Amino acid sequence: MQPRSVSLRRGTGFFQQLRLPESVPYVYFQGGEVVRILVIGSGGREHALVWKLKQSPRVSEVFVAPGNGGTAREGAINVAVDAGDLDGLVELARKEKIDLVVPGPELPLTGGITDRMREAGIPCFGPDAYCARLEGSKAFAKDVMNRAGVPTARSQVFTDPDKAKNAVVKLGAPLVVKADGLAAGKGVVVARTTQEALDAVDDIMCKRAHGAAGAKLVIEEFLVGEEASFLCLCDGKTAVPLPSAQDHKAAYDGDQGPNTGGMGAYSPAPILPYDQAEAMADMVIRPILAALARDGHPFVGVLYAGLMMTGNGPKVLEYNTRFGDPECQPLLMRLEGDLVQIMLDCIEGRLRPESLSHTSQTALGVVVAAEGYPHAYPKGMVIENGAYVGLD
């Protein structure tokens, strides 16, 4: 397939905001043209993305870097390129004449994979590195939320562990202690006692349990309520809500144990019915898009607000800049329509609300994890007789 392409000049509306280099061709697709896709990642989310993308009649080939047994089972071609190897990913996309790149995890996005692909003239469904800091830095996200007037927990940011500990003693428990940077969903401690909060500061900032992610720390007020995940597809100026979802992060039954990247999810979340989606987007998504656009970086891709539904209304706990895992799995099971076309519409700045629809059925995803997760756990184990389990 040879897609049509045009060279855009600076100063042409939306594309000027995207800061496309003068010489980079912008590729767009007409209805009926087939595309070659590269999905980045190796988890259940990427398996779900491949499953959904391959339902499009426009897809000729799907590559996954590095992929897993599930993506191979869907007929995708797994390629041994790590999700964090930006040079390798760009080289792969060029070699295989990829028409659409779909990053799954946060690491390539915060590392600038969209910027790199854009420089190579390859459409990429995801935000640039500046916008991806919404997820990559909790302090940055708090700053944007405050500028945009988005409701969120009161917080303080620290780079000195002694000052952070003094604040813990002064504020008292319960508190939420967060590593500023990426920690695979495991850098948040809900401290029920002052000692737990002090230990969390020590682990994150002094012992560097999460490496460089703990160089800066965010201490937040403890919010009471029920959590929900609210995702919108965005084209830089338009945000279209997806159905709500709810994931459960505690490692053990009964919401007990340490936080994980997610042990399961379902959609919809009863706490956030779809008839409230537009109002929620107006409150927590569209103001962020406007703030980032004012910064000169329109947000393209999935913007995910992790919400706490409190007695005083919804408050944002965090933003992710990609599909959640495991929320992606039940969400994509409910999503109707051509996801390939929807992603291209987002990249091209012409997303239409009517292009998204979903089934009214409920979807559920459950995570099977190795013993010991999210702490040290064995890896490389073979999964037998359980990769596809039916629920009655």
Which role fits each region the language model picked out?
Residues 280-303, 320-391:
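Active-site "cap" helix and flanking loop/linker of ATP-utilizing ligase/carboxylase catalytic domains
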